[in-house]
Regions:
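Hydrophobic positions within repeat-based interaction scaffolds
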Residues: 27, 31-33, 48, 85-88, ...
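N-terminal leader/linker segments that initiate helical-solenoid repeat arrays
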Residues: 17-73, 80-89, 96, 100, ...
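Bacterial Sec-dependent N-terminal signal peptides
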Residues: 1-42, 64, 74, 98, ...
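Flexible helix-coil transition and linker loops at the boundaries of alpha-helical arrays
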Residues: 57-66, 97-110, 144-150, 184-191, ...
Length: 413
């Protein structure tokens, strides 16, 4: 199939690019647009094959913008192959070209630069470098100011929203999701951007504990699920599983995590399967099925590789293994896992809350009720703090939404 498409596109290139230079360039633009339309969904699922096709086509192009447009998409393929150094290197070539030729075809340069910085932001997110990701994504949005069309702007706003969600800044997260929704409405684009926006808003409201609103957005997104890539379906299934985990509907959570697990079978990066296997392991602990829990936790640890040694992640996984040990009444192992020394500024307060609850359970099982009470009080204190923070985030998100809605109202007037 790949060789047929290369031959077919080569034929189109010969037909479309013969004649005067302007006709040749128009033909190249049509060729590249056709190529990207054909391989849009294959970049994630067959990235190496797509690199071969794009590279073969680039070698015959005369227009530099078309050349670097394909190269920009190749950088995404390296990301999907989990070759992050190569993804950054190729992405850097595209950005350098755009910045050196800023006065050329300004509109096309802006669109390409916006796409390149959007890719770079996603790469930084993958590495957990959120400050660098935010900087790149804001550069992407700035690059598209005045560009026509701005079809990638909703995607940039979704990525910005996701960055702020990871930072725990839910007000700015909600702001950018709603900006993405406004842009999608104004551009009149297809279902895919709406799916990402609705899924993201569902995750946001799950984090805020507003489960009715979260469920509403999940249902909106689910109606569009068939039109999306495997990665987008994975994100939806894993997020839906987390929703049911938070509402304590563990059988439903298990169903959705298993769906996510099946989707990751075709992914070249082990990270996604590692995440969902961690979720499956924790869910089986809550369902009091220790053998299944151990299977998935052990496999998650294997799949995470070097990431397992990062303090924040190790603290989280040690906590899950401690829960498993408590379930099996292996109190010495549970105590050893819960007694590790970590720098608290590197640890999510939610995980500290869970570990204090585990310590309370441990000492209750040991008959040391005084210590069990002390750890219960510490857990309650963190829980109160987290609840207050959630309320503040909810109020801030409502305030942002209100200000956006009233701004639109004034424009309509």
């Amino acid at each position: 199939m790949a060789y047929y498409i290369i031959w077919r596109l080569s034929w189109l290139w010969l037909v479309g690019c013969s004649g005067r230079p302007s006709e040749r360039m128009d033909g190249e633009i049509r060729l590249v647009d056709s190529l990207l339309a054909i391989y849009k969904d294959s970049m994630a699922e067959s990235p190496r094959q797509v690199i071969e096709v794009f590279s073969a086509t680039r070698s015959r192009l005369h227009d530099s913008l078309d050349y670097y447009n394909l190269l920009s998409h190749e950088s995404r393929c390296y990301y999907y192959l989990n070759q992050m150094d190569e993804a950054f290197r190729v992405n850097g070539q595209v950005i350098t070209y755009c910045e050196r030729n800023a006065l050329a075809d300004r509109n096309r340069i802006r669109i390409l630069l916006g796409d390149a910085y959007n890719n770079r932001g996603v790469f930084w997110q993958e590495l957990g470098q959120r400050d660098s990701a935010l900087l790149s994504l804001k550069k992407a949005a700035d690059a598209l100011k005045g560009a026509i069309p701005r079809t990638s702007l909703p995607s940039i706003y979704v990525n910005l929203a996701d960055c702020y969600m990871q930072e725990g800044d839910y007000s700015w997260c909600g702001y950018y999701y709603r900006q993405a929704l406004l842009q999608a409405d104004s551009l009149g684009i297809g279902d895919r951007d709406y799916f990402a926006i609705y899924s993201g808003l569902a995750k946001l409201y799950t984090e805020l504990g507003n489960y009715p609103e979260a469920d509403d957005y999940f249902r909106k997104a689910e109606q569009l699920r068939k039109s999306c890539t495997a990665y987008e379906r994975y994100f939806f299934a894993n997020t839906r599983g987390n929703y049911y985990y938070n509402t304590k509907e563990y059988d439903h959570a298990l169903e959705w995590f298993r769906r996510a697990d099946r989707i990751t079978d075709a992914f070249p990066q082990p990270l996604y399967k590692a995440i969902v296997h961690g979720n499956l392991g924790e869910t089986f602990i809550l369902l009091r099925q220790p053998d299944s829990a151990r299977f998935y936790l052990d496999d998650a640890r294997r799949l995470f590789g070097k990431a397992y040694d990062q303090p924040a992640f190790r603290y989280y996984m040690d906590g899950l293994y401690a829960s498993l040990a408590l379930l099996e009444n292996d109190l010495p192992l549970a105590e050893r896992l819960l007694s590790g020394v970590y720098e608290q500024e590197q640890i999510n307060p939610l995980y500290t809350y869970y570990n204090n609850r585990r310590m309370a359970e441990l000492y209750e099982k040991k008959g040391n009720y005084r210590k069990a009470f002390d750890f219960s009080r510490m857990a309650e204190h963190i829980d109160d703090s987290l609840r207050n923070e959630k309320v503040r985030n909810s109020l801030a998100e409502i305030d942002f939404r209100y200000r956006q809605d009233t701004t639109l109202l004034r424009k309509d007037m």
